[in-house]
Every structure is written in C-alpha cells, then in structure tokens.
Amino acid sequence: MNLHEYQAKDLLESYGLKVQKGIVAHNPNEAAQAFDQLGGKFAVVKAQVHAGGRGKAGGVKVVKSSQEAREVAESLIGKNLVTFQTDAEGQPVNSVGVFEDVYPVTRELYLGAVVDRSSRKVTFMASTEGGVDIEEVAHNSPEKILKVEVDPLVGLQPFQAREVAFKLGLEGKQINDFVKTMLGAYKAFIECDFALFEINPLAVRENGEIVCVDGKINLDSNALYRHPKLLALRDKSQENAKELKASEHELNYVALEGNIGCMVNGAGLAMATMDIIQLYGGKPANFLDVGGGATKERVIEAFKLILDDENVKAILINIFGGIVRCDMIAEAIIEAVKEVNVTVPVVVRLEGNNAEKGAKILADSGLKLIPADGLADAADKVVKSLG
C-alpha cells in the first residue's frame, strides 16, 4: 500500500526526521489559505498522486502568492496527472500539498531503503545524486550509490550511518543530523512494516540543516492488519479499479497491454505462462493468480475480471491441481462461461489432481472449449485461435 507524500512526511516526522512543512488542500480555497498560513514569500504546490515524475508532468509548481496557489490547485484538483510511471489515463488528483520553500540548498542527496529479498535484509541506499531519478543514476553511474545491509539481529547501528555520512561528504553538524535521519527512518521502517521508502531529495540547506523535501513510502500489505491507523490512510482512488476488485476476491491481478487473458493458479506458474505466450508470438493481457486454494466463486470472478478488458480476444486457463482439484475447476469454468457469456476462444490446460476427471467434465459440457495436452500446446493453440 502506497502513502501520499504528505502522509509519508507526517509519518517520518513522527520518528524525528526534519521534513519540509506543508498543508494538504482538497480545493483551491484551501490551497490559498495554506499559502498564507505557511507565511513565506514562496511555496511549492504538489499534486498528491501515487506516482513519480510529477515535476516533469506539470504536477509541481512554485507559487509566489495565495492567488497563484489557488490557480495552480484549480488546474490540478479534479484532473488526472499522467507521468512516466502511470498509464495513459494517469492518476486522479484529489488533493495538493502546499509546502514551504526550503531553497536555496547547498546539496541534494538521496536516501532510501528496501527489503532486499536476495540478502533477506533491509538494505539502505544513499547517493550524492539526489533530486533526479535514482533509476537513471543506478543505470548510468552505479558507483555513485552507496549500499548498507542491516543485520536484523542488531538493527542499523550509528557507526553505519556515520560511515554513509562521511562517504556523502557531509561534515560537522550535518553528520549528526544525517545519522539521526537514517536511524529514525530505519526505526519507522521496522515498526511500520515498510516495503520501501525514499527521500529524494534529502536537502542540505544553507544553514546546514538536513530536510526531507519529498517522501515516498510503500507499506507491506501483508502486515497492514497490525497497523489499523496506517490502513485508514489508504486511498483507493489511486489504485487500478480492476486490481482493487481482484483483491476483494483474494485474486492477484495485474493488467497488461496484450490480448490473451490468463487465468492460472500459482504466481510462478502464472509467470511461466506469460513467458511461453510471448515465446509463441502472443501478448498476455494480464497476470492473474487465482491462488492454490481456488474456489468456484473465485474462478467465476476471475473470468469476469479478464473479460472486463475489451482488448482480450482469447483466454488461456492453466491449472495445476494440487490443493485445488481439477474437476472442481472444470465445473467452475463451465458455470463461469455460461454466466458471463464468454464469446472469445478459451483454451484449457489441466494437470495434476483429478485432471482426467476435469477434462471429461469439460468435454461433456457441450461448450466450445479448446483442450490442451501441455503448456506448450496450450500456448500454441491460444495464439493460433486469434487467427
């Protein structure tokens, strides 16, 4: 689950980090009042969406008066912001953040952390190249990114943070401020179950103060039951409508841009299914994992989700029966095809628990389903069914 910038800053501030002060505004009048309330000569109005690249997309503007703040807010709120991280429709802007002007600054740094699944540790990343896309830095100048793996048994140690500060070229009071920032960020990461966080840029002001000018936090959705207050911050308007609907039925769904709908049980098998569709010249329209314990109701909802996509011209169902029985899946497929009125070709590959019984149920159904003997055969048939 993602947080908005203003929510991320509030959370980080509660852990002792110095952040760029700001006020969230849900309409132009509130934006104008926020400018006056901040009391500076300048302010920055930022669209609050769950996507990066806001500045290049026109979602971040410097304003010099309350009237300008009102006008910028009016141009953003109620519209969709399209960035390089969104789809063509963009993300809806329901609010803007009006933040204090912290510039000029002497330096812009980058600080982030992620759960590194290969090392099974929280890994911090820091760089002198703040204020730009860190992905570009990683690609073009990987040597400029410092990495620190945190031993989960002892946590982040002050000496590790100091070492990073030295390598970033900080000095004097800046070092202590940075250590406090990094230790506070780690404490927030662990206590709030972050999956990822970024401060980009982490600015060094002319007076030596270190301030979080931006904040991005992604929470581990599997741990949200432990954090009802954080769960209350969820903004469903920023989530893909289909993916949101899928999560309500315990389906893992990600929309793609192809025309072959996929229904698979198991994330690994789903990835392999998409790969082999590509290998045979097709393009998957989605990633859809119905789970190891798929029920008849879940399969029906999965069909509805797939067919909600107008680009889908064929469907490949790939089920490996383990916990789930193939005969139950076959019955669910038949019921779903009848209920949803499927008009596109449907290729079905069943293997494992009661696969033969499931295949017979499908064959006796009278429906125009295309059976497949293996994964390669299924991919070949679904691609050829497109004509």
From Swiss-Prot:
Binds 1 Mg(2+) ion per subunit. Keywords: ATP-binding, Ligase, Magnesium, Metal-binding, Nucleotide-binding, Tricarboxylic acid cycle. One of its GO terms (molecular function) is magnesium ion binding. ATP binds at residues 46, 53-55, 100, 103, 108. Substrate binds at residues 265, 322-324. It catalyses: succinate + ATP + CoA = succinyl-CoA + ADP + phosphate; GTP + succinate + CoA = succinyl-CoA + GDP + phosphate. This is Succinate--CoA ligase [ADP-forming] subunit beta. Its cofactor is Mg(2+). It is an enzyme of class 6 (ligase). It comes from the Bacteria. Heterotetramer of two alpha and two beta subunits. Pfam families: ATP-grasp_2, Ligase_CoA. Succinyl-CoA synthetase functions in the citric acid cycle (TCA), coupling the hydrolysis of succinyl-CoA to the synthesis of either ATP or GTP and thus represents the only step of substrate-level phosphorylation in the TCA. The beta subunit provides nucleotide specificity of the enzyme and binds the substrate succinate, while the binding sites for coenzyme A and phosphate are found in the alpha subunit. Pathway: Carbohydrate metabolism; tricarboxylic acid cycle; succinate from succinyl-CoA (ligase route): step 1/1. It comes from Francisella tularensis subsp. tularensis (strain SCHU S4 / Schu 4). The gene is sucC. Mg(2+) binds at residues 200, 214.
